[in-house]
Amino acid sequence: MSENGTVRAMWTDAELDDALSALHKETEPPSADVRATLMLACRETPPKPRRRYTWAAATAAVAALTAGVLTIPGAPSAAAEALDSAAAHVLAEPDPRPGPGQFFYTSTRESAMASSMTSTGKPLSLLEESMTQLWVPAIRAEEWFVRSGQTGARKWLVGNEDLARREGDGGLLDPRVSRERVQRGLCGDFPDQRELGGTPDDGKPCGERYGHWEAPTPRFLADLPRDPDALYERLSKDAKGRGADVLRLASGVLRAAETSADLRAAVYRALVKLPGLDVTDNAANLDGRRGTALGLTEGDLRDEVIVDTASGRYIGRRSVLVKPGTGYWAGLQPGTVVEFTAVTLGVADKAGTPPAN
Protein backbone atom coordinates (compact mmCIF):
# COMPACT_ATOMS: atom_id res chain seq x y z
CA MET A 1 0.00 0.00 0.00
CA SER A 2 1.07 3.53 -0.25
CA GLU A 3 2.69 4.83 2.59
CA ASN A 4 2.06 8.19 1.19
CA GLY A 5 -1.07 7.66 -0.78
CA THR A 6 -3.70 5.21 -1.78
CA VAL A 7 -3.51 1.43 -1.71
CA ARG A 8 -2.46 -0.48 -4.79
CA ALA A 9 -3.48 -3.97 -3.90
CA MET A 10 -2.57 -6.22 -6.82
CA TRP A 11 -0.17 -4.51 -9.26
CA THR A 12 2.89 -5.92 -10.97
CA ASP A 13 5.92 -3.66 -11.36
CA ALA A 14 5.49 -3.48 -15.15
CA GLU A 15 1.84 -2.47 -14.90
CA LEU A 16 2.63 0.13 -12.27
CA ASP A 17 5.25 1.66 -14.55
CA ASP A 18 2.76 1.79 -17.44
CA ALA A 19 0.09 3.32 -15.24
CA LEU A 20 2.43 5.93 -13.82
CA SER A 21 3.43 7.10 -17.29
CA ALA A 22 -0.20 7.93 -18.04
CA LEU A 23 -0.98 9.70 -14.78
CA HIS A 24 -2.22 13.29 -14.82
CA LYS A 25 -0.25 15.59 -12.56
CA GLU A 26 -3.25 15.94 -10.22
CA THR A 27 -3.42 12.22 -9.52
CA GLU A 28 -3.04 11.07 -5.90
CA PRO A 29 0.48 10.00 -4.93
CA PRO A 30 1.01 6.28 -5.70
CA SER A 31 1.68 3.64 -3.14
CA ALA A 32 4.88 3.00 -1.26
CA ASP A 33 5.85 0.09 -3.50
CA VAL A 34 5.58 2.36 -6.55
CA ARG A 35 7.59 5.07 -4.88
CA ALA A 36 10.18 2.55 -3.72
CA THR A 37 10.74 1.45 -7.31
CA LEU A 38 11.26 5.08 -8.32
CA MET A 39 13.62 5.66 -5.40
CA LEU A 40 15.75 2.73 -6.54
CA ALA A 41 16.03 4.26 -9.99
CA CYS A 42 17.25 7.53 -8.44
CA ARG A 43 20.14 5.98 -6.56
CA GLU A 44 21.96 4.65 -9.65
CA THR A 45 21.98 7.86 -11.68
CA PRO A 46 20.63 10.76 -9.62
CA PRO A 47 18.60 13.02 -11.93
CA LYS A 48 19.10 16.74 -12.12
CA PRO A 49 17.00 18.69 -9.61
CA ARG A 50 13.55 19.09 -11.12
CA ARG A 51 9.89 19.48 -10.38
CA ARG A 52 8.70 17.38 -7.46
CA TYR A 53 7.48 13.87 -8.06
CA THR A 54 3.76 13.68 -7.32
CA TRP A 55 4.41 10.59 -5.22
CA ALA A 56 6.59 12.42 -2.72
CA ALA A 57 5.35 11.84 0.82
CA ALA A 58 5.87 13.96 3.88
CA THR A 59 7.25 14.59 7.39
CA ALA A 60 7.85 17.17 10.03
CA ALA A 61 8.09 15.07 13.15
CA VAL A 62 11.15 12.91 12.57
CA ALA A 63 13.62 12.93 15.42
CA ALA A 64 17.28 13.26 14.44
CA LEU A 65 16.59 13.16 10.71
CA THR A 66 20.13 14.14 9.86
CA ALA A 67 21.85 12.10 12.53
CA GLY A 68 24.69 9.97 11.22
CA VAL A 69 24.26 6.25 10.79
CA LEU A 70 26.64 4.28 12.98
CA THR A 71 27.78 0.96 11.58
CA ILE A 72 28.70 -1.41 14.36
CA PRO A 73 31.92 -3.45 14.11
CA GLY A 74 31.21 -7.10 13.48
CA ALA A 75 27.89 -6.15 11.95
CA PRO A 76 27.16 -9.40 10.09
CA SER A 77 27.16 -11.38 13.35
CA ALA A 78 25.26 -8.56 15.05
CA ALA A 79 22.65 -8.67 12.28
CA ALA A 80 22.28 -12.43 12.64
CA GLU A 81 21.86 -12.12 16.40
CA ALA A 82 19.25 -9.37 16.06
CA LEU A 83 17.27 -11.22 13.41
CA ASP A 84 17.37 -14.51 15.29
CA SER A 85 16.11 -12.71 18.40
CA ALA A 86 13.29 -11.09 16.43
CA ALA A 87 12.31 -14.45 14.94
CA ALA A 88 12.24 -16.15 18.33
CA HIS A 89 10.15 -13.40 19.91
CA VAL A 90 7.63 -13.15 17.08
CA LEU A 91 6.96 -16.88 17.39
CA ALA A 92 6.36 -16.46 21.12
CA GLU A 93 3.77 -13.72 20.60
CA PRO A 94 0.08 -14.44 19.90
CA ASP A 95 -0.75 -14.32 16.18
CA PRO A 96 -3.58 -11.73 16.12
CA ARG A 97 -6.44 -12.65 13.83
CA PRO A 98 -9.76 -10.79 13.48
CA GLY A 99 -12.96 -12.53 14.46
CA PRO A 100 -16.32 -12.18 12.72
CA GLY A 101 -17.06 -8.54 11.97
CA GLN A 102 -13.51 -7.41 12.82
CA PHE A 103 -10.75 -6.09 10.57
CA PHE A 104 -7.02 -6.39 9.99
CA TYR A 105 -5.72 -2.86 10.55
CA THR A 106 -2.59 -1.34 9.00
CA SER A 107 -1.43 2.21 9.64
CA THR A 108 1.43 3.45 7.48
CA ARG A 109 2.99 6.82 8.26
CA GLU A 110 5.60 7.85 5.73
CA SER A 111 7.96 10.69 5.10
CA ALA A 112 9.85 11.02 1.85
CA MET A 113 11.87 13.63 0.07
CA ALA A 114 10.71 15.88 -2.75
CA SER A 115 13.23 17.94 -4.68
CA SER A 116 13.19 20.80 -7.19
CA MET A 117 15.00 24.03 -8.10
CA THR A 118 14.13 27.68 -7.84
CA SER A 119 13.93 29.87 -10.93
CA THR A 120 17.53 30.93 -10.24
CA GLY A 121 18.82 27.36 -10.01
CA LYS A 122 19.03 26.98 -6.23
CA PRO A 123 18.24 23.44 -4.98
CA LEU A 124 15.20 22.86 -2.79
CA SER A 125 14.47 19.68 -0.83
CA LEU A 126 11.95 18.88 1.84
CA LEU A 127 10.33 15.99 3.62
CA GLU A 128 6.56 15.75 3.73
CA GLU A 129 4.43 13.32 5.70
CA SER A 130 1.55 11.17 4.54
CA MET A 131 -0.69 8.71 6.34
CA THR A 132 -2.55 5.65 5.04
CA GLN A 133 -4.92 3.59 7.19
CA LEU A 134 -6.35 0.36 5.82
CA TRP A 135 -9.07 -1.89 7.24
CA VAL A 136 -9.37 -5.37 5.69
CA PRO A 137 -12.33 -7.46 6.88
CA ALA A 138 -11.86 -10.95 8.28
CA ILE A 139 -13.80 -12.13 5.22
CA ARG A 140 -11.74 -10.54 2.44
CA ALA A 141 -14.60 -10.55 -0.07
CA GLU A 142 -16.46 -8.02 2.06
CA GLU A 143 -15.95 -4.25 1.98
CA TRP A 144 -12.50 -2.79 2.65
CA PHE A 145 -11.93 0.77 3.86
CA VAL A 146 -8.91 3.01 3.23
CA ARG A 147 -8.13 6.57 4.32
CA SER A 148 -5.04 8.23 2.86
CA GLY A 149 -3.47 11.60 2.22
CA GLN A 150 -0.79 14.01 3.29
CA THR A 151 -0.87 15.27 6.86
CA GLY A 152 0.53 18.73 6.12
CA ALA A 153 3.66 18.08 8.20
CA ARG A 154 6.78 19.30 6.43
CA LYS A 155 10.52 19.65 7.16
CA TRP A 156 12.91 21.57 4.95
CA LEU A 157 16.24 19.90 4.24
CA VAL A 158 17.64 22.35 1.67
CA GLY A 159 16.30 25.88 1.34
CA ASN A 160 13.19 27.18 3.07
CA GLU A 161 9.67 28.34 2.38
CA ASP A 162 10.67 31.97 2.10
CA LEU A 163 13.20 31.16 -0.63
CA ALA A 164 10.68 28.97 -2.43
CA ARG A 165 8.02 31.69 -2.40
CA ARG A 166 10.49 34.40 -3.42
CA GLU A 167 12.27 32.58 -6.26
CA GLY A 168 9.74 29.92 -7.20
CA ASP A 169 9.38 26.38 -5.89
CA GLY A 170 9.35 24.46 -9.18
CA GLY A 171 6.07 22.84 -8.18
CA LEU A 172 7.42 21.61 -4.86
CA LEU A 173 4.61 23.15 -2.81
CA ASP A 174 1.78 22.13 -5.15
CA PRO A 175 -1.33 22.09 -2.89
CA ARG A 176 -3.21 19.67 -5.13
CA VAL A 177 -1.45 16.62 -3.70
CA SER A 178 -2.34 17.35 -0.08
CA ARG A 179 -5.99 16.30 0.05
CA GLU A 180 -7.22 13.35 2.11
CA ARG A 181 -9.09 10.60 0.34
CA VAL A 182 -11.46 7.94 1.68
CA GLN A 183 -12.37 4.90 -0.40
CA ARG A 184 -14.37 1.71 0.02
CA GLY A 185 -14.38 -1.39 -2.13
CA LEU A 186 -15.32 -5.05 -2.00
CA CYS A 187 -12.19 -7.19 -1.80
CA GLY A 188 -10.07 -4.03 -1.99
CA ASP A 189 -11.36 -2.97 -5.41
CA PHE A 190 -10.98 0.75 -4.82
CA PRO A 191 -12.03 3.36 -7.39
CA ASP A 192 -8.48 4.61 -7.97
CA GLN A 193 -7.47 1.17 -9.24
CA ARG A 194 -10.06 1.38 -11.99
CA GLU A 195 -8.84 4.88 -12.86
CA LEU A 196 -5.35 3.49 -13.38
CA GLY A 197 -6.48 0.54 -15.48
CA GLY A 198 -7.22 -2.16 -12.94
CA THR A 199 -5.03 -5.05 -11.76
CA PRO A 200 -4.09 -8.51 -13.04
CA ASP A 201 -6.54 -10.05 -10.56
CA ASP A 202 -9.54 -8.01 -11.71
CA GLY A 203 -12.61 -10.15 -12.23
CA LYS A 204 -11.28 -13.07 -10.22
CA PRO A 205 -13.13 -14.25 -7.11
CA CYS A 206 -11.58 -12.70 -4.03
CA GLY A 207 -10.19 -15.99 -2.75
CA GLU A 208 -8.42 -16.69 -6.05
CA ARG A 209 -6.44 -13.47 -6.22
CA TYR A 210 -2.69 -13.89 -5.87
CA GLY A 211 -1.05 -10.50 -5.42
CA HIS A 212 2.72 -10.09 -5.12
CA TRP A 213 5.47 -9.35 -2.60
CA GLU A 214 4.40 -5.78 -1.89
CA ALA A 215 0.66 -6.45 -1.92
CA PRO A 216 0.39 -10.09 -0.84
CA THR A 217 -2.84 -12.05 -0.58
CA PRO A 218 -3.35 -15.12 1.62
CA ARG A 219 -2.62 -17.31 -1.44
CA PHE A 220 0.70 -15.56 -2.07
CA LEU A 221 1.68 -15.77 1.60
CA ALA A 222 0.73 -19.45 1.83
CA ASP A 223 2.97 -20.26 -1.15
CA LEU A 224 6.10 -18.73 0.37
CA PRO A 225 8.48 -21.30 1.88
CA ARG A 226 8.99 -21.29 5.63
CA ASP A 227 12.47 -22.73 5.32
CA PRO A 228 14.85 -19.73 5.56
CA ASP A 229 17.22 -21.05 2.87
CA ALA A 230 14.40 -21.63 0.40
CA LEU A 231 12.77 -18.32 1.26
CA TYR A 232 16.01 -16.41 0.76
CA GLU A 233 16.50 -18.14 -2.59
CA ARG A 234 13.01 -17.02 -3.64
CA LEU A 235 13.62 -13.46 -2.42
CA SER A 236 16.97 -13.23 -4.18
CA LYS A 237 15.55 -14.62 -7.42
CA ASP A 238 12.59 -12.23 -7.48
CA ALA A 239 14.87 -9.31 -6.51
CA LYS A 240 17.25 -10.31 -9.32
CA GLY A 241 20.04 -10.58 -6.76
CA ARG A 242 19.95 -6.94 -5.70
CA GLY A 243 20.23 -6.54 -1.95
CA ALA A 244 18.16 -3.35 -1.68
CA ASP A 245 15.34 -5.08 -3.54
CA VAL A 246 15.57 -8.10 -1.25
CA LEU A 247 14.93 -5.75 1.68
CA ARG A 248 12.09 -4.04 -0.18
CA LEU A 249 10.33 -7.30 -1.03
CA ALA A 250 10.84 -8.68 2.47
CA SER A 251 9.37 -5.47 3.90
CA GLY A 252 6.24 -5.97 1.82
CA VAL A 253 5.57 -9.23 3.62
CA LEU A 254 6.59 -7.95 7.06
CA ARG A 255 4.24 -4.97 6.87
CA ALA A 256 1.24 -7.07 5.73
CA ALA A 257 -1.23 -7.56 8.58
CA GLU A 258 -2.21 -11.01 7.31
CA THR A 259 1.34 -12.40 7.48
CA SER A 260 1.49 -15.23 10.01
CA ALA A 261 4.05 -15.40 12.80
CA ASP A 262 5.84 -18.40 11.30
CA LEU A 263 6.33 -16.55 8.00
CA ARG A 264 7.55 -13.39 9.74
CA ALA A 265 10.11 -15.49 11.60
CA ALA A 266 11.17 -17.16 8.35
CA VAL A 267 11.65 -13.75 6.69
CA TYR A 268 13.87 -12.57 9.56
CA ARG A 269 15.98 -15.72 9.36
CA ALA A 270 16.17 -15.50 5.57
CA LEU A 271 17.56 -11.96 5.82
CA VAL A 272 20.46 -13.29 7.90
CA LYS A 273 21.76 -14.69 4.60
CA LEU A 274 21.78 -11.32 2.82
CA PRO A 275 25.42 -10.40 2.03
CA GLY A 276 26.54 -7.07 3.43
CA LEU A 277 23.71 -6.71 5.92
CA ASP A 278 24.79 -4.77 9.00
CA VAL A 279 23.26 -3.16 12.08
CA THR A 280 22.56 0.33 13.43
CA ASP A 281 21.31 0.23 17.01
CA ASN A 282 18.66 2.40 18.61
CA ALA A 283 17.30 3.75 15.31
CA ALA A 284 14.23 5.94 15.78
CA ASN A 285 11.41 5.64 13.28
CA LEU A 286 8.83 8.20 12.27
CA ASP A 287 6.58 7.63 15.27
CA GLY A 288 9.43 7.70 17.76
CA ARG A 289 9.43 3.97 18.37
CA ARG A 290 12.92 2.55 18.64
CA GLY A 291 14.29 -0.64 17.22
CA THR A 292 17.29 -2.20 15.54
CA ALA A 293 17.96 -1.03 11.99
CA LEU A 294 19.38 -3.65 9.66
CA GLY A 295 20.47 -2.57 6.24
CA LEU A 296 23.02 -2.33 3.49
CA THR A 297 24.48 0.35 1.27
CA GLU A 298 24.17 0.44 -2.50
CA GLY A 299 25.15 3.53 -4.44
CA ASP A 300 24.25 6.74 -2.65
CA LEU A 301 21.75 5.25 -0.22
CA ARG A 302 21.65 2.93 2.74
CA ASP A 303 18.38 0.95 2.92
CA GLU A 304 17.25 -0.36 6.29
CA VAL A 305 14.46 -2.31 7.88
CA ILE A 306 13.77 -1.46 11.52
CA VAL A 307 12.71 -4.21 13.90
CA ASP A 308 11.87 -4.31 17.60
CA THR A 309 13.97 -7.33 18.47
CA ALA A 310 12.38 -7.59 21.93
CA SER A 311 8.96 -8.33 20.43
CA GLY A 312 9.76 -9.34 16.86
CA ARG A 313 7.53 -6.56 15.53
CA TYR A 314 8.40 -4.93 12.24
CA ILE A 315 8.49 -1.16 12.83
CA GLY A 316 9.32 0.22 9.41
CA ARG A 317 12.08 1.12 7.00
CA ARG A 318 14.23 4.08 6.06
CA SER A 319 16.72 5.26 3.44
CA VAL A 320 19.78 7.30 4.42
CA LEU A 321 22.07 9.28 2.13
CA VAL A 322 25.65 8.09 2.64
CA LYS A 323 27.52 10.49 0.32
CA PRO A 324 27.50 14.27 -0.14
CA GLY A 325 24.41 15.02 -2.19
CA THR A 326 24.57 15.81 -5.92
CA GLY A 327 21.92 15.95 -8.62
CA TYR A 328 18.57 15.06 -7.11
CA TRP A 329 20.21 15.03 -3.66
CA ALA A 330 21.99 18.41 -4.14
CA GLY A 331 22.79 20.22 -0.90
CA LEU A 332 22.17 17.23 1.38
CA GLN A 333 24.78 15.97 3.84
CA PRO A 334 25.73 12.32 4.44
CA GLY A 335 23.52 10.88 7.16
CA THR A 336 20.37 12.67 5.97
CA VAL A 337 17.28 10.48 6.10
CA VAL A 338 15.49 10.87 2.76
CA GLU A 339 12.73 8.35 3.39
CA PHE A 340 11.20 6.99 6.58
CA THR A 341 8.24 4.68 7.05
CA ALA A 342 6.47 3.54 10.22
CA VAL A 343 3.98 0.68 10.23
CA THR A 344 1.48 -0.25 12.94
CA LEU A 345 -0.54 -3.46 12.73
CA GLY A 346 -3.54 -4.56 14.74
CA VAL A 347 -7.11 -5.81 14.82
CA ALA A 348 -9.95 -3.27 14.70
CA ASP A 349 -13.59 -3.68 15.64
CA LYS A 350 -14.92 -1.16 13.15
CA ALA A 351 -13.87 0.12 9.71
CA GLY A 352 -12.65 3.70 9.98
CA THR A 353 -11.75 3.39 13.67
CA PRO A 354 -8.21 2.36 14.69
CA PRO A 355 -7.72 -0.29 17.40
CA ALA A 356 -7.73 1.00 20.96
CA ASN A 357 -4.16 -0.22 21.51
Language-model segments: residues:
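N-terminal export/targeting signals for secretion/compartment entry
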Residues: 1-88
